[in-house]
Amino acid sequence: MEEIQRYLQLKRSQQHNFLYPLIFQEYIYAFAHDRSFSRSILSEKTGYEKKSSLLIVKRVITRMYQQNPFIIFLNDSTQNKFLGHNNNFYSQLISEGFAFIVEIPFFLRLISSREGKKKKIVKSQNLRSIHSIFPFLEDSFSHLNFLLDILIPHPVHVEILVQTLRYWVKDASSLHLIRFLLNEYCNSNCVFIPKKASSSFSNSKRNQRLFLFLYNSHVCEYESIFFFLRNQSSRLRSTSSRVLLERIYFYGKIEHLVNVVVKVKDFQANLWLVKEPCMHYVRYQRKAILASKGTSLFMNKWKCFLVTFWQWHFSLWFHPRRIYINQLSKNFLECLGYLSSVQMNPSVVRSQILENSFLINNAIKKFDTLVPIIPLIASLANTKFCNVLGHPISKPVWADLSDSHIIDRFGRICRNLSHYHSGSSKKKSLYRIKYILRLSCARTLARKHKSTVRAFFKRLGSELLEEFLMSEEDVLFLTFPKASSTLRGVSKSRIWYLDILCISDLVNYK
């Protein structure tokens, strides 16, 4: 137990004192604000963005020097006549600037890791892609048996997030500033839920960056136990007496954490908890997966250990029902908009020795990914592209747009869904989604022109909708025109793209 505490303290003691002077530099806030409003990843520009500029930010900083900082946020409804923004605009600048500053150490750590490898390094933007997770699952999970499907609880108290930064930010004023920004959007006596609480801090797009940093910092704190256990278990492979004593000593610490009474006759069975070197951990947002080659009993021990350890040391309430034990060969795993499983593909090999011949039955494990068509249709129904049965309907709110704009919107949605679900082994589900979007687009245009769908197609022709029906194979041909003969038929197989950085609302139906 003491060794684990020293490990966590070592991770937390990595301070970056050089960041403190940046908090008081006005150009940091100007740069962070300008970069925040210049980015448009999968989002449309708003009118508020057009009103923002670097000159406005400089004027805001100048007026911040002339006002009492404790009076700025007292009345949010009071509008600043000089700038044309609410007084909440000040907190926006501070939160964006502070989020930019605290991200610097992690960016430097990424640069140092890239410089250490020098050659044969994967580009960082490829590692950031969501699809980069699936090749890892395909290579690793086909050899594993069980996994823990963990749903990380998201209600986090404001003070817990602030306490996470106290280990490496020793400046009290900075911590009070973060606490003030968080409490501005939620009561200090409540917990804020990222996706449900309408008045929560995270729902404010302008402060989402700071919240995501604080939340991920908190998650990384209790994820660090996996690195500690892996380092310990990696040196427990020898059977010498000296290492055996280390095993007993280390298992005693695990026993203290999980509060389990270990008997002598159960020692070898319980030792398997830390003996297993083949553990794989993957997390994206609130979804975490812990897979192993062990048995169901082994995964139950890990479940008990994780729930107890995280609750005692990180104030993270894990209900046991949030962690499911899944057998890969029998059940599907819902992850990142896919249904993943490990299928057994039987194969028969005929062998002959001299005059005798016999058949050998082999079963090869294969990692398979499918598109969950029912939840995807439910997402389309929630966004009014179809009804609950999957029948396409018109989109009345888009009927006032131009024809080209309507077709472009439907086509963009269709291409994004096809692009994201290109890793599916069966493409028939995507054809149904394309059909729903195409007919919904046609009905929207027919509604705008006060005509029927058949009359609309007869008058304008079906080629008007071919823009968003481009297949994945056509996209590959446009991307690699010289390799068209080589890529023929590739679209029927699974394709993982390394340029997908976020999940759309239609895919993230949960």
Curated annotation (Swiss-Prot):
It comes from the Eukaryota. GO terms for molecular function: RNA binding. It is found in: Plastid, Chloroplast. The gene is matK. GO terms for cellular component: chloroplast. InterPro entries: Domain_X, Maturase_MatK, Maturase_MatK_N. The lineage of its organism: Eukaryota, Viridiplantae, Streptophyta, Embryophyta, Tracheophyta. HAMAP family: MatK. Transmembrane segments: none annotated. Usually encoded in the trnK tRNA gene intron. Probably assists in splicing its own and other chloroplast group II introns. It holds the Pfam family Intron_maturas2. GO terms for biological process: mRNA processing; RNA splicing; tRNA processing. This is Maturase K. Keywords: Chloroplast, mRNA processing, Plastid, RNA-binding, tRNA processing. Belongs to the intron maturase 2 family. MatK subfamily.
